[in-house]
Amino acid sequence: MSLERATLWSILGAYLLLPASTVVDFPAFPPLDKVTISNVSAFFVCRFILGKRIKLLPNLGIGKILILIYITSPFMTAFLNPEPIIAGARFIKGMEYYDALSAIIRQSLFILPFILGFTFIRDSKTHEELLWVLAYAGLFYSLPMLFEVRFSPQLHTWVYGFFPHNFGQQMRGGGFRPVVFIGHGLLVAFFAMSSLVAVSTLWKLRKPIKGYSAGIISLYLGGVLILCKSFASLIYASLLVGLIQLASPKRQILVAKVLVLLVIFYPMLRAADWFPINNIYSIAAEFSEDRAQSLKFRLDNEEILLTHVRNKALFGWGSWGRNRVYDMESGKDLSVTDGRWIIVMGEYGWVGFLAEFCLLALPVIRSTKVIRYVKDRRERVVFGAITLLLAISIVDLLPNASVSPWTWLLAGALLGRIEQIKFRAKVRTTNLHTEFIDNER
């Protein structure tokens, strides 16, 4: 197995198979879970066992700046939050330099797949390999998913001895959402959607999968996705598969860019009270009153948390639950934090939010400038599909809280590919210029 393929499988395999909500907490070190352990293991093997040189920073200047801010901003958060929070009987200690160091280490561990991505998964061959890994992983994982759809989410309990989340949240429409080992049915549905998009791209490339048409397998994975009972993932799949099959890669990338810009500007519009909440609620109510009420509950909680963020807007409130809102008399937690964006903004403020989300969005935004240099049709199809997958992963961070190692790997891989395309275009231009001068002589 090649290094690139092993890197892809190690990050994705750990996400799919290791237990969710399991943490090993060492003193003076951030908690270790399946995300951080797999990230460190993959990095350690590549660097110290295989002896591969790993670039810690991309060539792109803005990328370097965003990484450094992402890693170091918790120091300022801790420095500006020394006071405790007292609400009724609840006491939350002030931030200390130990907390800053722990957060900086945690941020560094989270970003390791991004670094591995732009170091190793950076050419057309490895990008197509990425799609194959997603396709095979989706087919493999569909079996336990279908089992849990039929018999309820039991595998995590049987294998690891506990259930990682609220069981009631996995009950939908008289049946069950599969959970397997990822931790929540919505995350499983998003993975199924990603696998469907990968197989659909292989179908576009006319690549059979083990002798079977990728189109037939797309229909199968589409059926599995429907059984996951996630409306959002169905919308994502419909949009991405439709774009991949019907739109040019250039248009796909344009749509991806618009999506990530909307994600970045959404908190700004909410903070400025320019987001049309009432109009969106009215539209949702026309389709389903239950979904409209759920949306209103989510938006109301975001408003409560945004009001709290305004008191420490730049660098946030820090960890230990300081970003949440409590009743000052009873100490009761009044917060429901669903979206990743509001969690990051509450903990690390606007600086932390912009560092994380702009770093994830940077490859998508830059891709519009390099697609014209990709001449091969197959490479353009793959480039467009991966850009769309990354964009929709960023969009999903608005309603959901989990940014997976796979999302960071996608972002790093796309940034590495962009750097390679720009380098080759520069070399080609230099060679043409040299030939022109030689001919003139």
Predicted regions and their residues:
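N-terminal hydrophobic segments of proteins, predominantly signal-anchor/transmembrane helices
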Residues: 3-26, 36-108, 393, 440-441
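Interfacial loop-to-transmembrane-helix boundary motif in multi-pass membrane proteins
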Residues: 7, 58-70, 107-108, 116-147
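Alpha-helical transmembrane segments of multi-pass inner-membrane proteins
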Residues: 112, 131-155, 159-160, 170-247
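A membrane-periplasm/extracellular boundary helix in multi-pass inner-membrane enzymes
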Residues: 143, 149-153, 228, 245-289, ...
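A conserved mid-to-late transmembrane alpha helix and its immediate loop/hinge
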Residues: 184-186, 221-224, 230, 315, ...
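Hydrophobic transmembrane alpha-helices and their immediate junctions
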Residues: 238, 242-245, 348-391, 418
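Long extracytoplasmic/lumenal interhelical loops at the membrane interface
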Residues: 277-348, 367-374
